[in-house]
Each structure stands twice: as structure tokens, then as C-alpha cells.
Design a protein with these regions (language model features):
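Conserved acidic
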Residues: 1, 36, 167
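Short, membrane-interfacial amphipathic segments enriched in basic
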Residues: 1-7
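Short amphipathic alpha-helical coupling elements at transmembrane boundaries
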Residues: 7, 11-15, 49-53
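Alpha-helical scaffold elements within enzyme catalytic domains, especially in hydrolases
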Residues: 12, 73, 228, 276-279
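Cytoplasmic juxtamembrane interface segments
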Residues: 16, 194-202, 279-285
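Basic-flanked hydrophobic alpha-helices used for secretion and membrane insertion
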Residues: 42-248
Length: 285
């Protein structure tokens, strides 16, 4: 081994020690910044996505069908996981006897969980004379928003002969739910006045049911899966685009700009160190 050459190399490195340290530190800072940005991007996206699911539900597709007749294609589909059901037994009628779009019915615990439906005040109905109402529906009813107050619901039921009868039910406002009827895709199909299953049966006129399904975690081509599901069912199928087409921060472009800025700063720092080193060499020689 040429010891003189090695000594020369070590002396050269020692002489340029400050420049080498500065350049290495600049490169380290750039890599650390990029790594930190990747971690921030992942965590922020997960936080934003969870916030969206809290508002619009964790469900993937919603099917409007009949109570007791869940679509077998969806129920046994390999890409779909859990399901929940809400039953709209009747429509609310206004004081003039006109039917409104507001529905009354009940929800299963699975539907409440998958829809991330929660109470802002109070609780879900526990007794047959209690009702929980989402905020949007409560505003439409225009009967007040104090827990424990009476909520008067007018509906129409039919007997076995097809004869209709106007009936009025009074419920105690047990809970106020965060709005979903005016924010979800297909939220207008979901009953906004929630009562117990038994109370719903007492005023049942319709046999309408809404089923929601979640998708497996490993699936990422959501739109293609949705298109495939539509071809397998003749029922009305609604896609939760608010969640599964969600793009945080303008589709992630802001992160691309941040990457570019960090890389440019790194290049500028390294270029500066090289220019300082080159100037130092000229002075020596």
C-alpha cells in the first residue's frame, strides 16, 4: 500500500474537514426534512381521512331496498365487510296534511356504528315514547331543540283494506344527532326521526330499508369496485364519494411543492459549500 498517498489523502481530508462537515450536515438536514415530511404527510392524511369518516360515515356503499330482503350479492360479496340497516317506516306529514321527505324509523346498532352517527346532546331512544332527531331534521320540524320537550309527529297509516288513517304521535326529545340527512350522499333516504323498533312498528306504512356496507382495507380501486357492484344489483346503490374520493390539501400538491422547496434548498446549500471550497483552493494555490 502506498503510505505516502494515504497520508496525503488523510491530510487533504483534514484540511477540508470544515467543508466536509458542512456539506454532510446539509445533506443530512435535507434527508431528515424529507423523512419528516413523509411522516407528517401520512399522519395528516390519516387524521383528515378519519375526520371525513366521522362526518360522512365509514360506509362504502348504500343500498335502498326492502326490510328483510337484503341483497344477496352485496351481503356475500368478497370485497364488502360489515353491514348495517336503517328502516324508514313512514314519512312525516306537515300541519296541512302534506307528506314531507322527512322519514321516521329506527336504526340497528351496526348502522349507527358504521355511519359514525353520534349524539351531540342526550342519547338514542331507550323507551317507546322517546325519539332522537338529527339537527337538520330538527330545524325542519321547527318545534324547538330542548331535551325532554315534546316532539309531535303526524303520519298516515294504512289498514289491511288499504284505508288510510291520520295519526299523531308525541315523543320526548331524548337526543339530538349530528346531521346526516343533509350531508351524506343519500342521506335524504335515511330516517331523520329515530325511535325504538317497537315504536316504529306501531306506525309502519312503508317497508323501506337502507343498508350500508364497509369495504375491505386492502381494496384501493374504489370506483371500479363500485361500478362492478352496480352491475350486480338492480337496486338503487349509492357511493360514499365524500370519503372514498377524498383528496386532502388539493390532492397532495402542497406536499409536492414542499418536496421541491426542500430539494432546492439542499442543492443550493451543497452548491454554496462547493463554491466556498473551490474559492479556498484558489487562494491556497
Amino acid at each position: 500500500m502506498n503510505t505516502e498517498y494515504m497520508d496525503y489523502c488523510f491530510k487533504s481530508i483534514k484540511r477540508r474537514k470544515k467543508n466536509i462537515i458542512k456539506t454532510s450536515f446539509t445533506i443530512f438536514i435535507v434527508f431528515a426534512a424529507v423523512t419528516l415530511l413523509i411522516l407528517i404527510r401520512t399522519n395528516v392524511y390519516q387524521w383528515q381521512l378519519q375526520s371525513v369518516k366521522d362526518r360522512f360515515g365509514s360506509w362504502f356503499v348504500m343500498m335502498c331496498g326492502s326490510d328483510g330482503k337484503e341483497n344477496s350479492e352485496l351481503k356475500g360479496h368478497p370485497y364488502l365487510k360489515e353491514s348495517g340497516k336503517a328502516v324508514k317506516v313512514n314519512n312525516v306529514y306537515d300541519n296541512g296534511g302534506e307528506m314531507t321527505e322527512t322519514g321516521i324509523g329506527y336504526m340497528t346498532e351496526e348502522f349507527i356504528r358504521l355511519g359514525n352517527i353520534s349524539t351531540e346532546e342526550g342519547h338514542f331512544p331507550q323507551k317507546d315514547d322517546e325519539a332522537a332527531v338529527d339537527w337538520n331534521t330538527l330545524l325542519e320540524l321547527n318545534q324547538g331543540s330542548s331535551l325532554g320537550q315534546d316532539i309531535v309527529i303526524r303520519t298516515v297509516i294504512s289498514d289491511e283494506n288499504g284505508q288510510t288513517e291520520d295519526i299523531t304521535r308525541t315523543y320526548k326529545l331524548a337526543g339530538i344527532l349530528k346531521s346526516y340527512t343533509n350531508s351524506w350522499a343519500g342521506g335524504d333516504r335515511v330516517p331523520g326521526v329515530i325511535v325504538t323498533e317497537q315504536a316504529a312498528k306501531d306506525i309502519k306504512r312503508n317497508n323501506n330499508a337502507i343498508y350500508i356496507y364497509t369495504v375491505d382495507d386492502y381494496v384501493n380501486d374504489y370506483e371500479a369496485i363500485y361500478d362492478g357492484l352496480k352491475k350486480k344489483t338492480s337496486s338503487s346503490l349509492i357511493y360514499n364519494s365524500s370519503v372514498y374520493e377524498y383528496e386532502p390539501w388539493s390532492g397532495g400538491n402542497i406536499y409536492d411543492y414542499m418536496y421541491m422547496i426542500i430539494v432546492l434548498v439542499g442543492i443550493a446549500g451543497i452548491t454554496y459549500q462547493l463554491s466556498v471550497y473551490s474559492t479556498g483552493r484558489k487562494r491556497v494555490y
